């Protein structure tokens, strides 16, 4: 077992019998790497350096198999690869697993991952490792903070020491948490937010770690918006449609009796995009008519039957769950065989250049014989699949318009009846479905009639005789209107001259003769008037002192003895006002820090107090946890009130009245909370006394 090519100075520390990729072998833990040697071989089939191991997961103690899953960083591809080993010793499999877990954690300086993952076979799940070593070093961006085993974040006094092992930032904040829903990214956001916000960090240390008045979850519950708006949150750009087609889902594992498939949300989304009939069937049947797991079983079975339709053992087409939702694909072929009655009479049917936008499929244009639907019936589904995917990649707005126009109106009524059904169906999550090998011969056959979807304006040749007279008259009337709109040209029509009302004036002299001759100036008078205007304009001088306001001298008034006496009286008040302005400036000092810290602490306590407070007779009665939390916060509010009251008295004794007044609003808010708590206590005591009185009587 120990015979394999070892490097210089390499020493084997642990070894165990394991399976990797369904092959039996031996796993070695050396001083330099992790080596797996397949049975019957002398050379290592797999070797992993300890420094490249980033995460490890183990199966739960209740699991039937002892599994070890390692996440290894590939230095070439710069991506994480996963390796799963199954310990197969008859008696010591679990102990071997624990030994490897502890050794890897101690050597690679790993922390316990936060999210459990599934094993490769899909039947056993793995959970985070329990015994891991703490972090020896800290990231430069996260100096002074560490994640405790209970999920809280505290200052680390040893963080200033040099790091023994240099690790990436994303691997430092994994810890063994009591909150399984807390992900690594959420921990990183919280730590970085506390590191960047000094006031929030002080509040967190005081309320959560030191006084333990508020729990970790309650503290972050009211700060979800800060985490969402935090700069650490990755701004993920929406990924477009990939250009490659999704291949058929491959089985994750196979056994003699069953084949296991794994449908991830990404795979399901791709299936819905590439196969609209599957999405329609899902919305119409899941979860009211059929379970999600059975739905994907039928989907896998339908793929088998679709592949084997030409064989003798294939079930009828109507047996497929998705057959009735594929009528829109079949209508593409049927529409070419329809005889159209309600057609545009202005369409040039002789146009065969292919560039006339008014000519559409079905208007009598001769088709290429190579595109005959009868000859391409087997190839058309594949061609439509490629064309539809190309349109999706390019973001075409008129995607498959011709395919959906015939079923749009018919599906409108169906959507109304199944609106409630579709609203209750939720997006699927990662699902594992099983398709047994015996289901091929035991599939139930159900006959469904494919209804022909008709457009009101399209009629088959058989339906031409069933058209009523009213429908034909309506069609002809529409044709007449359409023709009139195109044959009548407004520019060629005679203009209708409008008759205007004539202006009748009885005395035209009043409007057209002007002034009398006596008021008309002569030429000499006109020239004199122009000369006077020109002389005044050239000789004009501005007189600005007369325009401006002339102020009177007030020096004599200010020097009166009454004013001097008045200033002497108000001189102390003026000095006090000047001092108060300087006092309110609040430069950086211990008082300002103390004031802001007291304000934030009281604000946090009051927010949680009023969130957990209750009034007898109003709303649902509080739970025991809410009552305990309210009592704990009330005690903290009373202590905070006494501290601030002492600070205020001390400032008053130092003649800092204005500074002491800044604490008054805080004390008033705390006093209201204390009064509310006392009233609750009195009401509760009074109610209990009444109950005891009635019981005694």
UniProtKB/Swiss-Prot annotation:
Primary site of residence: nucleus
Transmembrane spans: none
Keywords noted in UniProt: DNA damage, DNA repair, Nucleus, Repeat, Transcription, Transcription regulation
Gene Ontology biological-process annotations: DNA repair; nucleotide-excision repair; transcription by RNA polymerase I; transcription by RNA polymerase II
Region (Disordered): 115-141, 228-250, 412-462
GO CC annotation terms, alphabetical: nucleotide-excision repair factor 3 complex; transcription factor TFIIH core complex; transcription factor TFIIH holo complex
Composition-biased stretches (Basic and acidic residues): 412-422
Annotated disulfide bonds: none
SUPFAM superfamilies (UniProt xref): BSD domain-like, PH domain-like
Compositional bias per record (Low complexity), positions renumbered to this chain: 115-136, 423-452
Family matches, as InterPro entries: BSD_dom, BSD_dom_sf, PH-like_dom_sf, Tfb1/GTF2H1, TFIIH_BTF_p62_N
UniProt function note: Component of the general transcription and DNA repair factor IIH (TFIIH) core complex, which is involved in general and transcription-coupled nucleotide excision repair (NER) of damaged DNA and, when complexed to CAK, in RNA transcription by RNA polymerase II. In NER, TFIIH acts by opening DNA around the lesion to allow the excision of the damaged oligonucleotide and its replacement by a new DNA fragment. In transcription, TFIIH has an essential role in transcription initiation.
Quaternary structure (record): Component of the 7-subunit TFIIH core complex composed of XPB/repB, XPD/repD, gtf2h1, gtf2h2, gtf2h3, gtf2h4 and gtf2h5, which is active in NER. The core complex associates with the 3-subunit CDK-activating kinase (CAK) module composed of cycH/cyclin H, cdk7 and mnat1 to form the 10-subunit holoenzyme (holo-TFIIH) active in transcription.
Family, similarity comment: Belongs to the TFB1 family.
Protein name: General transcription factor IIH subunit 1
